[in-house]
């Protein structure tokens, strides 16, 4: 079986505009690649504009699509609002928000500082909240329907897990927000979904598991 074959037809996402937070590398980059291959226009965000620009250039050459890099720290609502305005100026609309920006520490919890714990909560939970709220307010105020928010969570958002407590806490919050807004915003034509891909090899994951040379 050829697992490289697309599940969706060519141009399935033609004329769609998607925002991918944490889109410069890893899972975000992989999802952005697929969206571009399916015909979507994609805005990718993170704090590292150089990485974003390199990724956007690479993916546009690879797919022939349009990828817009925007520096944005999702922990700050004003930056999220600015990012949204830049996307609207470039593409005129947004159809999908993909909350993928994340962080994690693999560590006994008692060894973490309060600031380290807060950092993960702020990126994952507060960042997802900021982006969801900004896009939701925009769509609702404009009366735009058939919109989607897709949140990336983890399997331990349901089960909990030792040594990743800040991430587990934040992802459980994102899951609760997703379920709650799925009910509240359904009347506005906004779909809320969350997926938990499970573990897979990315540079970010390997750097945390193998932080030094063996």
Where are these regions (language model features)?
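Substrate-binding pocket helix/loop in short-chain dehydrogenase/reductase
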Residues: 108-109, 113-121, 205-206, 214
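Active-site loop-to-helix junction immediately N-terminal to the catalytic Tyr of the SDR YXXXK motif
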Residues: 112, 160-168, 180, 205-208
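Conserved glycine-rich cofactor-binding loop
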Residues: 17, 22-26
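Active-site helix of classical SDR
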Residues: 132, 170, 178
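The beta1-alpha1 cofactor-binding region of Rossmann-like NAD(H)/NADP(H)-dependent oxidoreductases
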Residues: 49-50, 71-83, 114
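A glycine/serine/threonine-rich, flexible loop-to-helix segment
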Residues: 55-57, 187, 199-214
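Alpha-helical segment proximal to the catalytic Tyr-Lys
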Residues: 137, 141, 183-187
């Amino acid at each position: 079986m050829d697992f490289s074959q697309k599940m969706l037809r060519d141009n399935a996402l033609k004329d769609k505009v998607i925002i991918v937070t944490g889109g410069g590398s890893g899972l975000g980059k992989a999802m952005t690649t697929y969206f571009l291959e399916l015909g979507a226009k994609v805005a990718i965000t993170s704090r590292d504009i150089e990485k974003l620009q390199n990724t956007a250039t690479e993916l546009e050459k690879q797919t022939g699509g349009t990828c817009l890099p925007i520096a944005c720290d999702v922990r700050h609502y004003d930056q999220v609002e600015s990012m949204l305005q830049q996307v609207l100026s470039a593409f005129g609309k947004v159809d999908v928000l993909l909350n993928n920006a994340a962080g994690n520490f693999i560590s006994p919890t008692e060894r973490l500082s309060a600031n380290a714990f807060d950092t993960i909560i702020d990126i994952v939970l507060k960042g997802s909240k900021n982006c969801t709220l900004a896009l939701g307010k925009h769509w609702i105020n404009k009366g735009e329907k058939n919109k989607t928010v897709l949140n990336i969570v983890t399997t331990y958002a349901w089960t909990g897990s030792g040594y990743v407590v800040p991430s587990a806490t934040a992802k459980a919050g994102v899951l609760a927000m997703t379920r709650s807004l799925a009910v509240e915003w359904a009347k506005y034509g906004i779909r809320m979904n969350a997926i938990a891909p499970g573990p897979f090899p990315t540079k970010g994951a390997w750097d945390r598991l193998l932080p030094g040379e063996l």
